[in-house]
Design a protein with these regions (language model features):
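Glycine-rich loop at the start of a catalytic domain that most often binds anionic cofactors/ligands
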Residues: 64-69
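C-terminal structural segments of small proteins and small subunits
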Residues: 70-114
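Small/polar loops that bind or transfer phosphate-bearing groups
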Residues: 5-6, 54-55, 77
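Glycine-rich nucleotide phosphate-binding loop and flanking beta-alpha elements
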Residues: 11, 59-61, 115
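Acidic, metal-binding active-site segment of PIN/NYN-like and related structure-specific nucleases
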Residues: 46-63
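Ribonuclease/tRNase effector modules and their secretory precursors
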Residues: 1, 19, 91-95
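Intrinsically disordered, low-complexity and often Lys/Arg-enriched segments
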Residues: 1-2, 116-119
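N-terminal first-folded block
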Residues: 2-50
Length: 119
């Protein structure tokens, strides 16, 4: 199980995931795919049977059109700080990984704070 971190997420998340959860993770820039199209990235991830962590809904559409693999972790919490995203993933990622291990192809991670609560 390897997680590819899409370009609109901080590449630092990859190292944090490795250090925090002991799961292989790599930023797309580090494997030469930072400037790839969504389709190119999706097909490369399909070939490698990886997990793509992304904020981009295009990956959800590609998954619907082309099927898994890859599996998708879809981050829908909007713009947020790296610190807040790490806090959110620190809580959610164990359950997300369990769902993926159980065969889910798409898991959405969102911030369910009440409106107006500060991040």
């Amino acid at each position: 199980m390897t997680i590819w971190i899409d370009a609109q997420l901080s590449p630092a998340l990859a190292l944090w995931i490795v250090q925090t959860f002991g799961i292989p993770a790599v930023a797309l820039r580090d494997i030469g795919l930072r400037d790839g199209t969504d389709r190119q990235i999706f097909l490369a991830a399909k070939e490698q049977s990886t997990i793509v962590m992304t904020k981009d809904a295009d990956f959800v559409r590609l998954l619907e059109d082309l099927g898994p693999p890859p599996q998708i972790i879809w981050i829908t919490c909007g713009n947020t700080s790296n610190a807040h995203l790490k806090q959110l993933l620190g809580t959610a990622l164990p359950r997300v990984l369990a769902l993926l291990s159980d065969g889910e192809s798409l898991v959405e991670v969102s911030d369910l704070r009440p409106k107006g609560e500060k991040r």
